[in-house]
Amino acid sequence: MKSIKDISPEILRSTAIIRFQDCDPYAHLNNGRYLDYFMNAREDMVWKAYDFNIYDYSRETGLGWVVSQNQIAYLRPAILMEEVIMESQLTESRPKFIQVEMRMLDTAGKLKSLLWAQFIHVDIRKAKSIAHSDELQELFDKVCLPIAEKDFNDRLKVLNVG
């Protein structure tokens, strides 16, 4: 992991191409596949931005995160072979919990989908929740970009203007 002093809060960004095998017969990204695109993008972003590989972390420590809740809105279809912009940010962090907001946009910046994902930190061997280490909590506190809206639909209204 990068030194915490070298990390600053930011919205993480990447791009993805909507692939054939992920689409329905109408050439739209299948609703179930949005989660895969969001999670894959987030994992890659965290690895690139913070040099933090969650799979190495899990293998080395026996700890990891499980999804406890997702809220997702599908606003505009993502189309076969379309390039989309993926954004994510940590919006909330507590000792055993993090919430991440992820957005899929077209190349003009228009919102296609919004996801709030909540994760619980767990000891995989004991199947019990566990507090983040001081080092992880310090990282999360440093990179967290809280949002004003605490309700998903209110946030959707703010982001989906125009």
Positions of PLM-derived features:
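Short, charged beta-turn/beta-strand-edge "cap" motif at the junction between a beta-strand
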Residues: L90-S93
